[in-house]
Amino acid sequence: MKTNGLFKMWGLFLVLIALVFSACSDSHKEKKDALEVIKQRGVLKVGVFSDKPPFGSVDSKGKYQGYDVVIAKRMALDLLGDENKIEFIPVEASARVEFLKANKVDIIMANFTHTKEREKVVDFAKPYMKVALGVISKDGVIKNIEELKDKELIVNKGTTADFYFTKNYPNIKLLKFEQNTETFLALLNNKATALAHDNTLLLAWAKQHHEFKLGITSLGDKDVIAPAIKKGNPKLLEWLNNEMDSLISSDFLKEAYQETLAPVYGDEIKPEEIIFE
């Protein structure tokens, strides 16, 4: 009886040891930097917008197009040797952080504005674009914040515009939507008086909807847009920072601008107003 008891205890001990080693092994796997994971996988997973031309959208053939997309494909080329070794994953503004935390994407390239609040939850690489908030309305009737009193303002959930007006102007009623298509459709259908978003996007949209104008072209701080990754991946962050330096010094950002943004903005906007040189 005693012998059987000893065998049982010894068996239990071995099981516990196996569990400990398994846990240690899993912990080691979890600590592997995202850069190593991407190289082993052979595919770069990038979160982009699917409804925000000319930065990230899907064309009639189901292909992703836009400024963010072109830069992301160059990242895949420089990291994995082939710009096609990339998987674009559509993401809404309010889900960008969660997609990183859940490892659904390696990098967010969805017009993500670098803010102090977001720094607490994700790591930003060096920026590739300049941006500020703008407000668009029919005929540009809204020319200052005071004119929004007792009126509704459209914003996208989880965007800089959402945070800015919620924090600084809590008395302005916000009409919030997840998707950019919903946001602009609401403005076209007169669901609210005006819409607040990145001025770069509003300028592009106004080019196709001439009855709408930016009455407020720049609001609040001038910000930057940068690639974002999940915290705790220093090797990937270092690689991204070096990559951004390279894309700027080689004039690749200028080339991407000419390919995707210049046809939209024309001569009204100078490249240096938007991109880093």
Language-model features and meaning:
Residues 29-109:
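Extracytoplasmic small-molecule ligand-binding "clamshell" domains
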Residues 95, 112-120, 164-167, 181, ...:
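A ligand-binding cleft/hinge motif common to bilobed small-molecule-binding domains
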Residues 73, 77, 85-147, 214, ...:
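Acidic, polar ligand-binding/catalytic clefts
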Residues 25-29, 70, 74-78, 151, ...:
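Extended ligand-binding regions for polar small-molecule ligands
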Residues 31-33, 86-98, 140, 175-185, ...:
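Short helix-initiation/N-cap motifs at beta->coil->alpha
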Residues 50, 129-139, 199, 203-245, ...:
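Periplasmic-binding protein-like
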